[in-house]
From Swiss-Prot:
It holds the Pfam family FCD. SUPFAM superfamilies: GntR ligand-binding domain-like, Winged helix' DNA-binding domain. The gene is uxuR. One of its GO terms (molecular function) is DNA-binding transcription factor activity. Keywords: DNA-binding, Repressor, Transcription, Transcription regulation. The keyword Transcription applies. This is Uxu operon regulator. Residues 51-70 bind DNA.
Length: 266
């Protein structure tokens, strides 16, 4: 290996390490701010300190603080008012309570519902996506890959990818439906049980590849291809979860909502 190649590889690894540090740091700052909101240090309606004040408090750059604020905004905990500041609009506990009365549905029933809804969302998103939307999806996908290489059991980027697709449609009803489907997942005891069995990164790696296929279709504005890619992605998830399931479990719903490789309407 030449000296120049070694330098290039060193620079590439350094850049990746720095990106990983940034991702871990903004998540940590976001969690600390969420704790402050939960503990009542900042109440609903309160204005959060400025970027400069938060960066000085935690000893991080203002860029890190900005990313943490975006994280809180995505989670609907704060609202950014241009020219005014960032305000607390909800607490983490209120969001949890809001969805605590949702029924515990089986994972395969949930995946079937997601398959029907999200394939249409992907189709529409392919027609609506802007350059900014594509860039956002790429950033989320890169975060998924980084979390995988770090062997972190963190699937937040997976959720962000699917929610970002719904937001591209600019249809608030679709966004709310998508958010609720994810809450069904978080409330599902059987889903949690199955998820705990996904110990091999191979599964997550395959799903990231599916996300790349979906993104490529959207980037090409190929609505039909985007719909089929999303349908197949969730079909792949169903197949893997079926393999991991205990079919003797009385709550197993895999036979009621079985695999269906055919995309409806094609």
């Amino acid at each position: 290996m030449s000296h120049i190649t070694k330098i290039k590889n060193w620079n590439t690894n350094l850049r990746k390490n720095m990106e990983n540090i940034v991702n871990r740091t903004y998540t940590r700052i976001g969690q600390l701010l969420k704790q402050d909101i939960s503990q009542g240090i900042y109440s609903i309606g309160d204005k959060l300190p400025t970027e400069r004040e938060i960066s000085e408090k935690f000893g991080v750059s203002r860029t890190i603080v900005r990313e943490a604020m975006v994280m809180l905004e995505v989670e609907k905990l704060v609202e950014v008012k241009k020219g005014s500041g960032v305000y607390v609009v909800r607490t983490p506990e209120s969001i949890h309570m809001e969805h605590s009365d949702l029924p515990d549905v089986g994972p395969f029933e949930l995946l079937q519902a997601r398959q029907l809804l999200e394939s249409s969302i992907a189709e529409f998103a392919a027609l609506q996506a802007t350059k900014k939307d594509i860039l956002n999806l790429k950033q989320i996908l890169n975060r998924e890959k980084e979390l995988l290489t770090q062997n972190q059991d963190d699937y937040s980027a997976d959720k962000d990818f699917h929610l970002a697709l719904a937001e591209i449609t600019q249809n608030d009803v679709l966004v709310k439906l998508q958010e609720q489907l994810w809450q069904y997942r978080f409330n599902s005891a059987m889903w949690a049980q199955l998820h705990s069995r996904i110990l091999q990164n191979d599964y997550h790696h395959l799903w990231i590849e599916d996300h790349q296929t979906i993104l490529s279709a959207i980037q090409k504005k190929n609505a039909n291809e985007a719909r089929k890619a999303m349908w197949q992605h969730l079909e792949n998830v169903k197949v893997k979860l079926f393999e991991l399931s205990d079919v003797e479990d009385p709550h197993f719903d895999g036979y009621l909502f079985n695999t269906n490789p055919v995309v409806v309407g094609i």
